[in-house]
Amino acid sequence: MKYIIRTIAIILIYGGVATIPSKAQIDEIGFGLGGLSYTGDLVRGYKLLQNKPAGTFFIRHNINDHVSLRYAVTGGILSGGDANNPVDPFAVQRNASFRITIVELSIMMEYHFLDFKSGSALTRFSPYFAGGIALFGMSGSNEKPEPYSSFQPAIPLSLGLKYIVNPKWMVGIEFGIRNLFTDWLDNVSEGDPLKKNYQYGNWYDNDTYYFTGFTLNYAFYRIPCPFPYH
């Protein structure tokens, strides 16, 4: 695990510095507001009402009309507990909960399925898919049941939709999942039932967290009006 974290950190730092666009090459800048939620030992599956406040700031370099590179910082709150919606009868007795702050650095490649930026585009919108690598840190007040790193790698995958408002501004909506290599996001993993106050969990099933939000970005270049709007 330490090797994985070190490798992804090197890619994000050195690879990001080497490929991050200069000021003249930054095509778009923007931010997003939304929520973070998670699934793991305390909460199973995505639940919209479990979302806690989150935000993201990003810059984007457009390689061509369909492919872009996005460099982002995302942060927010994650929480969950057995008391809210116990996953099984044993969870009632366990009565575990957590609340942490997440800060994530990511590099993602976006692919837009429709041509909506070129001068010959026939539409103002496009769905898109994004994937890449990320490194996140987590901080909370709960005592760790056993030592584990507060910095972890992740594989972010997202689906979204963008819409061109005018030649300089674009809005979007995105749903993203972070596939993790750790089962300690909720501070619950394996446990020894012979130990007092043990916290059991499924250590064969890693935790996952999600970002759902709306984005607004500004283009330093002029987005051509789609053909029907000329």
Residue ranges of predicted features:
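Short glycine/proline- and aromatic-enriched beta-strand/turn motifs that initiate or cap beta-hairpins
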Residues: 22-62, 211-226
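Repeated loop/turn-to-beta-strand initiation elements of outer-membrane beta-barrel proteins
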Residues: 27, 66-69, 117, 167-171, ...
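Residues on the lipid-exposed face of transmembrane beta-strands in outer-membrane beta-barrel proteins
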Residues: 31-33, 57-61, 107-111, 131-135, ...
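Outer-membrane beta-barrel proteins
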Residues: 38-44, 79-84, 118, 138-142, ...
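Extracellular loop and loop/strand-boundary signature of outer-membrane beta-barrel proteins
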Residues: 39-45, 90-98, 142-147, 199-202
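Residues that define the transmembrane beta-barrel architecture of outer-membrane proteins
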Residues: 49-53, 101-105, 125, 147-155, ...
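Gram-negative (and chloroplast) outer-membrane scaffold detector with strong preference
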Residues: 67-141, 212, 218-220
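Predominantly the C-terminal beta-signal and adjacent terminal strand-loop region
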Residues: 83, 166-230
